[in-house]
Amino acid sequence: MGQALLAERGVVTLLMGRNHLPQAMVIPMVANARMARVTAAQAALPADLADELWAAIIRRKIENQARAIELLGQGDASALWQLAGTVLAGDSLNVEGQAARLYFQMLHPGLNRRCDDPFNSVLNYGYAVVRAVLARALVTSGFVPALGIHHHSQLNAFNLADDLIEPFRACVDVIAPSIVSASAKLDARQRHALRDVLWMRVLMAGRKVTVSQAVEEVADSLVRAVRDLDCTELRLPTLISPEFDWEVRD
């Protein structure tokens, strides 16, 4: 009953496991007058447009990774900037993978993203927080979150959220070093600090907005992109020096 009431009010509910990491997500299936139109356009998305959208997403992801390295003073990000400029339609050369190998060794030397360690715990929790609000924004905009642009796993109900989270990941990455501790088990303080990523400011079309606001704008812009068959309609966040809008949160 409690979860149903939350869903009626548009609240995304994260269900936590024993390790305090999100294990499941309940998102509201809010009635939306344009849902049928958006869903039809999403299902009929041409492959070439999907490839263009994915290239734009990955390009911005790598650019934000470069910005994160520069903001954290973790080295020379010029190689990442160069890689961002080589992304082709559909990321056919897997520039994303090349950039990831370089980026994570600069961000946290010795990091293995497959390991269960303190730094990965921080990243994974922060990503899950952003993924949840992004999934909500996509559903309320009329999208079927299981139908991705690039991700197409039949076992993943949130392929589209996993596509669009990519440029947002650096927002978590840039605050992670100040939150990580010696334990892979996150405490209440760490979880609270990671949830605050939603009030972190980013640039959207030259305007400072919170991550929480940015995910709504990304979802709305994707509606225009699939409706008009125009990749340039998609708006994506640009990472800036971390600052938080506590007034919006309160």
What function would you assign to each model-found segment?
Residues 11-17, 21:
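Short hydrophobic alpha-helical runs that function as membrane-insertion/retention elements
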Residues 8, 21-250:
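Active-site helix-to-loop segments that bind/position phosphate- or nucleotide-bearing substrates
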Residues 1-4:
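An N-terminal domain-cap segment
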